[in-house]
């Protein structure tokens, strides 16, 4: 079920137009369940490829919440090996610019990989929410979990284009 990892040169080796340098931390997106729609699979791969231009990224499909926590580096035996962010309707909402700042701050201050997790149709258990470092929401509307994945991936890509001063975001 696991997807291959896509790599990019570290942001620390790149400079943006303001000559700022960025340190890179791996980003992992983990979701529950197989992708049923070919269009969703195609968009997932497209955005993983785009994100890989800026940072090492990995997309991983898992069977259930227990596998999700293990793949994200949050097992009882191993402890915490990543910063876990769950997509949840009760989470904090961000504008695209605020989300870019959130990612940039993590890149600058935290050496652990950043794992975004998307639950299944029933969301996350209280135990998973307690294990998370933060909860974020894609908005007040409810999205199908496969669609939420594509929206998250697009926003991660958009965040890196904002951080790098790329014109992708300027059309808003």
Label for each model-derived stretch:
Residues 5-7, 12:
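Serine residues within intrinsically disordered or low-complexity segments
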Residues 16-18:
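Intrinsic-disorder-associated, low-complexity terminal segments enriched in Asp/Asn/His/Tyr and depleted
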Residues 20-47, 51:
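N-terminal beta1-alpha1 ligand-phosphate binding loop
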Residues 29, 85, 119, 152:
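Conserved RecA-like P-loop NTPase ATPase core
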Residues 35, 89-92, 120-123:
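Short glycine-rich anion-binding loops that position phosphate/pyrophosphate groups of nucleotides
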Residues 52-115:
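S-adenosyl-L-methionine/SAH cofactor-binding core of RNA-modifying enzymes
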Residues 126-172:
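Structured adenosyl-cofactor binding patch, chiefly the S-adenosyl-L-methionine
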């Amino acid at each position: 079920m696991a997807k291959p990892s896509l790599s990019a040169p570290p942001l620390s080796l790149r400079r943006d137009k303001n000559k700022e340098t960025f340190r890179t931390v791996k980003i992992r997106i983990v979701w529950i369940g197989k992708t049923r729609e070919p269009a969703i699979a195609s968009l997932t791969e497209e955005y993983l490829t785009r994100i890989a231009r800026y940072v090492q990224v990995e997309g991983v499909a898992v069977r259930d919440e227990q596998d999700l926590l293990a793949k994200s580096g949050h097992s009882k035996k191993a402890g915490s090996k990543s910063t876990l962010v769950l997509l949840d309707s009760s989470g904090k909402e961000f504008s695209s610019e605020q989300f870019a700042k959130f990612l940039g701050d993590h890149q600058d201050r935290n050496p652990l990989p950043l794992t975004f997790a998307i639950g299944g149709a029933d969301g996350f258990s209280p135990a998973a929410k307690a294990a998370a470092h933060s909860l974020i929401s894609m908005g007040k509307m409810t999205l199908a979990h496969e669609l939420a994945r594509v929206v998250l991936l697009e926003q991660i890509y958009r965040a890196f284009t904002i951080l790098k001063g790329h014109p992708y975001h300027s059309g808003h």
